[in-house]
From Swiss-Prot:
Domain of life: Bacteria
Chief location of this protein within or outside the cell: membrane
Gene3D superfamilies from the UniProt entry: 3.40.1380.10, ATP synthase, gamma subunit, helix hairpin domain (1.10.287.80)
Protein name as annotated: ATP synthase gamma chain
Annotated InterPro entries: ATP_synth_F1_ATPase_gsu (IPR035968), ATP_synth_F1_gsu (IPR000131), ATP_synth_F1_gsu_CS (IPR023632)
Biological process annotations from GO: proton motive force-driven ATP synthesis; proton motive force-driven plasma membrane ATP synthesis
Gene name of this polypeptide: atpG
Keyword annotations: ATP synthesis, Cell membrane, CF(1), Hydrogen ion transport, Ion transport, Membrane, Transport
Length: 292
C-alpha cells in the first residue's frame, strides 16, 4: 500500500522535532561534560598530593611496616562491591557494560550467590540487581551532575566503616573510567585494603621537610579512612564524567540518525510527489485524447 504525501510530510515534521530535542540534549550534555572534566582534573591534583603524603609517612625515611588494619590483607569471607551507574537511560552502552562485568564477577567468584554485598550508586544498577533477586545493601539515587562530597559522604563513610568493622574483608569499586569523549574504560578497582601505595615513590628525606607532632600510627588511623573515602569519591566523579560523555555521544548519534531519516523521507516524498504529478499529467493527456 502506497504511503500518502501527507503521511510522509507528517513523519518528516515529527522526525525534525525529535532531532531538535536530541540536539538540545547533546548541547546540554556537552556543557555538563566540560564541568565534569574540570572537576575530575581538580580532584586528581588533590589525590596525587594526598597519595604522596601517605606514601611518605608509610615508607619514607626507612619507616617500618604499619600495623593499621586498613593496610593489611585478611582472609576473605565477604566482598563488598560499590557499583556506579546512571539514574536513567539515554547514555548508550554506559550502564550495560559495567553491569555485565559485575555479573561476570559474581558468577566467577560467588557462584553460590553468597559472600558479597552490593552498594549501588545510581538507580539503573539498583533496579538491575533487584530484578535478579540481589538486594543492594545500600543504594543512592539522584546525584547531581557534579556531585559534592556531602552528597555521597554518608554512603561512602558507612561503607568504609563496614570494612573497619569486618562486615566485609575487601572492597572494590566498579565503574566506567572516562578516557575521552568517545571512549570509557570499565574498571574494577580495589579500594580496601589499601595496597597500591608504592614504597619506591616515597621521599627518603620527608622527615627533613616536616615533623610529625604525634605518632605515625595515630596519624594513619585518622588519615587512611579519609584517603579511602576520597578515592571512592574520585571514582564517582570519574564515572559521572564518563556518563556525561556517553550521554553526549548518544544524543549526537540520535541526532545524526534523525537527519539521515529526514533525508531518506525527503527523497521518498519527492519521488512520491513526482509520481503523483506524472500520474496527473498522464490522466490529463488521456482525457484530452478521449475528447478528440
Amino acid at each position: 500500500m502506497a504511503v500518502s504525501l501527507n503521511d510522509i510530510k507528517t513523519k518528516i515534521a515529527s522526525t525534525k522535532n525529535t532531532s531538535q530535542i536530541t540536539n538540545a540534549m547533546q548541547m546540554v550534555s556537552a556543557a555538563k561534560l566540560g564541568r565534569s572534566e574540570e572537576a575530575a582534573r581538580n580532584f586528581q591534583v588533590y589525590a596525587q598530593k594526598v597519595r604522596k603524603l601517605l606514601t611518605d609517612i608509610l615508607h619514607g625515611n626507612g619507616a617500618g611496616a604499619s600495623t593499621n588494619p586498613m593496610l593489611i590483607s585478611r582472609s576473605v569471607k565477604k566482598t563488598g562491591y560499590i557499583v556506579i551507574t546512571s539514574d536513567r537511560g539515554l547514555v548508550g552502552g554506559y550502564n550495560s557494560s559495567i553491569l555485565k562485568a559485575v555479573m561476570e564477577l559474581k558468577e566467577e567468584y560467588h557462584p553460590d550467590g553468597k559472600g558479597f554485598e552490593m552498594i549501588c550508586i545510581g538507580g539503573m544498577g539498583a533496579d538491575f540487581f533487584k530484578a535478579r533477586g540481589i538486594q543492594p545493601l545500600y543504594e543512592l539515587r539522584g546525584l547531581s551532575d557534579q556531585p559534592s562530597f556531602d552528597q555521597v559522604r554518608k554512603i561512602i563513610s558507612k561503607t568504609v566503616e563496614m570494612y573497619q568493622n569486618e562486615l566485609f574483608d575487601e572492597l572494590y569499586v566498579c565503574y566506567n573510567h572516562h578516557v575521552n569523549t568517545l571512549t570509557s574504560q570499565m574498571r574494577v578497582e580495589q579500594m580496601l585494603p589499601i595496597v597500591d601505595l608504592d614504597p619506591n615513590e616515597a621521599d627518603e628525606e620527608y622527615s627533613l621537610t616536616f615533623e610529625l607532632e604525634t605518632s605515625r600510627e595515630e596519624i594513619l588511623e585518622q588519615l587512611l579512612p579519609q584517603f579511602a573515602e576520597s578515592m571512592i569519591y574520585g571514582a564517582i566523579i570519574d564515572a559521572k564524567t564518563a556518563e556525561n560523555a556517553a550521554g553526549m555521544t548518544a544524543m549526537q548519534t540520535a541526532t545524526d540518525n534523525a537527519k539521515k531519516v529526514i533525508n531518506d523521507l525527503t527523497i521518498q516524498y519527492n519521488r512520491a510527489r513526482q509520481a503523483a504529478i506524472t500520474q496527473e499529467i498522464t490522466e490529463i493527456v488521456a482525457g484530452a485524447s478521449a475528447l478528440e
